[in-house]
C-alpha cells in the first residue's frame, strides 16, 4: 500500500477550471495538488503536431476571449506572463461567408461595426448602436450572471441590485429579455439577413442553437465581448496557457501530476487506481456529472442519470503548403474565425437536423485561422486551418443530404472521413487552392474526441445540454445546482457547472473565491479584534 499524502486541496482534472482554481488557491498560500489522468495538462487545451512536423495545431479549443476577459486572468495574468504566456490579438476577429460569396464582419469598435452593418441594411448600424446603448449601462448585471455564484448571497445581491437600479418592473423586463432566443432578438432588431447570419453562428459556441431560450442573451454577450476584446490567442499555442498555470502552481509549492487516474472521491480526499490515498480538506472535481456521480462518488449513481448531453462536434485540422487564398472579400484571409453558413435559417436547420439524429446537409463550418495572428504555428510560407463542426449527432439515424449509408449509426473512421470530404468540398468553393495545397488532414469525430478526453462525453465539448432546465440556476442539475455536492468538502467545476462552457475558468474562479472567503468564525474574530 502506498503512503498517503496530505494537502489543503486536491484538484481532480486539469481542465481550465481545475487549473484556474488550483492556481488561485496556491497563490493564496494553500497546499494544492492537481491530478490529471491524461498525459498532458489542460483538458481540452492541447497543442500538438498532429498533421505534419512544424505545424502546431490547437487540437480541441483554440480561442481565448473568455479567459482574457475573465476574473481568473485578471487576477493571474501578470504572474502567467512571467511564465511565458503572451497573448496576440487582431482587429478582424470574425466574419460570416455566405454561399453566394458575400460576407459580413464583426470588428473592434462600435463605429466600425455600425458602418459594416449599414452595408447590408440602412438601419442596422443604428440598431447596433441602440443595442450597445441598452447593454452597457447594465453590463455589470449581464456579465455578473456569468461571474457570480447564483445560489449565494452574492447571487441574491445581483437581483437586489437589478431591482434597486431598474425598479421591480424594469428588473422583471430585464430578466425576461435574458430568455429571448437569438432568432427573436435578431429578427426584431436587425433588418438584414446578413446581420442575422453574422451573429447567429456564435450561439453554437455556447452550446445553444439560435431558437433556444437565452440564446439571444448569449449572442449579445459574445458580440459585445468580441467587439471589446477581439479574439486573443497565446503565442505558440493554447498549451502555453496550461503550461503557465502549472508553472505558477508549482512556483507556489503546489504539485501537478499527469497519468494519475483517480477512481474514488470522498469527504477528506481521493483514491487513485494504483491504491494511493491522497488526503485533502477540500476536493475540487473538474469532471462531468456522469463521472462525478456515476463513478467517483460512492452511493450517488442515480443522481446524474437524467443529465442530458448536447450536440456532438467534430474537428478537422489542415496543414497546407501555402496560405489559403479566399475568393471574394480580401478581409477573409486576415480574419481569425470565419463561419460558413447560409445564415440564421441555415444554422437553425443544421441544429434541428443534428437534434433529430441526422448528419446535417449543410452544417455551419467554423474556419479558424490562427496564422493571422501567430506565425509561429506553422513553417514560413505555409498554411494551417482549424475547423470545428458543432452540429452533429452522437447516435446517427440518417443523413439529411441522403448521400451516406450510416450503417449501425455509430461514428466509424470511414464515416468520419466521408463527412470531412463533404465539408472540404464546401471549403473548396471559397478557397480554390485548398485541395492542391493540402499536405495533411487530420479529422477527429465525436467518438475520437470522447476517446481523447473523458470530459468530452459523447463528443459534446460543452459539458452537457444547456437547455434552460440545465442552465444558470439549474446547472448542472436541478437537484444539485451550483458547485457544492452532497458530500461535504467535495466541489464540482467545469463546463457542466455554472457559468457553463467556454475557455474562461469561470467555475474554477468561483469555487476558489468561496474557499478563500473567511469563515463566519474568522469574520467574527476579526470584528472583535478591531
Residue positions per predicted region:
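Helical element adjacent to the flavin cofactor pocket in flavoenzyme catalytic cores
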Residues: 221-268
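Extreme N-terminal leader/targeting segments of oxidoreductases
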Residues: 1-9, 27-28, 471-478, 520-530
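A glycine-rich dinucleotide-binding beta-alpha-beta segment and adjacent secondary-structure elements
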Residues: 192-211, 360-368, 424, 429-498
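Rossmann-like flavin
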Residues: 99-213
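N-terminal glycine-rich phosphate/pyrophosphate-binding loop and immediately adjacent elements
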Residues: 2-147, 463-465
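Flavin-binding catalytic cores
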Residues: 121-124, 323-324, 356-360, 380-381, ...
Amino acid at each position: 500500500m502506498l503512503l498517503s499524502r496530505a494537502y489543503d486541496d486536491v484538484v481532480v482534472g486539469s481542465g481550465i477550471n481545475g487549473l484556474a482554481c488550483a492556481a488561485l488557491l496556491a497563490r493564496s498560500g494553500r497546499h494544492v495538488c492537481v491530478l490529471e489522468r491524461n498525459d498532458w495538462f489542460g483538458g481540452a487545451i492541447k497543442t500538438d503536431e498532429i498533421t505534419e512536423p512544424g505545424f502546431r495545431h490547437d487540437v480541441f479549443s483554440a480561442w481565448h476571449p473568455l479567459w482574457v476577459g475573465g476574473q481568473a486572468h485578471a487576477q493571474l495574468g501578470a504572474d502567467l506572463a512571467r511564465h511565458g504566456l503572451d497573448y496576440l490579438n487582431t482587429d478582424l476577429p470574425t466574419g460570416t461567408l455566405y454561399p453566394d460569396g458575400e460576407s459580413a464582419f464583426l470588428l473592434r469598435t462600435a463605429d466600425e461595426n455600425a458602418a459594416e452593418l449599414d452595408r447590408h441594411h440602412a438601419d442596422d448600424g443604428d440598431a447596433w448602436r441602440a443595442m450597445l446603448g441598452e447593454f452597457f449601462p447594465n453590463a455589470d448585471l449581464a456579465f455578473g450572471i456569468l461571474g457570480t455564484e447564483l445560489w449565494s448571497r452574492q447571487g441574491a445581491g445581483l437581483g437586489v441590485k437589478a431591482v434597486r437600479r431598474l425598479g421591480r418592473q424594469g428588473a422583471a423586463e430585464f430578466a425576461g429579455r435574458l430568455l429571448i432566443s437569438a432568432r427573436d432578438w435578431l429578427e426584431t432588431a436587425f433588418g438584414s439577413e446578413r446581420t442575422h447570419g453574422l451573429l447567429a453562428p456564435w450561439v453554437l459556441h455556447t452550446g445553444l442553437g439560435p431558437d433556444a431560450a437565452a440564446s439571444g442573451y448569449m449572442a449579445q454577450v459574445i458580440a459585445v465581448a468580441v467587439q471589446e476584446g477581439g479574439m486573443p490567442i497565446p503565442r505558440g499555442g493554447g498549451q502555453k496557457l496550461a503550461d503557465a498555470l502549472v508553472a505558477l502552481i508549482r512556483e507556489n509549492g503546489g504539485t501537478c501530476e499527469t497519468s494519475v487516474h483517480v477512481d474514488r472521491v470522498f469527504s477528506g480526499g481521493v483514491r487513485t487506481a494504483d491504491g494511493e490515498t491522497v488526503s485533502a480538506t477540500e476536493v475540487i472535481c473538474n469532471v462531468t456529472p456522469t463521472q462525478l456521480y456515476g463513478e467517483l462518488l460512492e452511493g450517488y449513481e442515480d443522481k446524474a442519470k437524467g443529465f442530458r448531453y448536447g450536440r456532438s462536434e467534430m474537428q478537422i485540422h489542415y496543414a497546407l503548403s501555402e496560405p489559403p487564398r479566399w475568393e471574394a472579400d480580401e478581409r477573409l484571409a486576415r480574419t481569425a474565425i470565419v463561419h460558413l453558413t447560409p445564415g440564421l435559417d441555415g444554422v437553425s436547420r443544421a441544429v434541428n437536423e443534428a437534434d433529430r439524429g441526422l448528419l446535417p446537409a449543410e452544417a455551419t463550418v467554423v474556419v479558424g485561422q490562427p496564422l493571422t495572428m501567430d506565425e509561429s504555428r506553422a513553417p514560413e510560407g505555409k498554411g494551417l486551418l482549424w475547423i470545428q463542426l458543432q452540429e452533429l449527432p452522437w447516435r446517427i439515424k440518417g443523413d439529411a443530404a441522403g448521400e451516406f449509408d450510416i450503417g449501425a449509426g455509430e461514428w466509424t473512421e470511414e464515416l468520419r472521413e466521408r463527412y470531412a470530404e463533404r465539408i472540404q468540398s464546401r471549403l473548396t468553393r471559397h478557397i480554390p487552392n485548398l485541395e492542391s495545397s493540402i499536405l495533411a488532414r487530420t479529422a477527429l469525430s465525436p467518438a475520437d474526441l470522447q476517446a481523447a478526453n473523458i470530459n468530452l462525453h459523447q463528443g459534446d465539448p460543452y459539458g452537457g445540454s444547456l437547455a434552460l432546465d440545465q442552465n444558470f440556476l439549474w446547472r448542472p442539475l436541478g437537484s444539485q445546482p451550483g458547485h457544492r455536492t452532497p458530500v461535504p468538502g467535495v466541489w464540482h467545476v467545469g463546463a457542466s457547472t455554472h457559468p457553463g462552457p467556454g475557455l474562461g475558468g469561470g467555475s474554477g474562479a468561483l469555487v476558489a473565491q468561496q474557499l478563500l472567503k473567511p469563515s463566519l468564525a474568522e469574520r467574527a474574530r476579526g470584528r472583535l479584534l478591531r
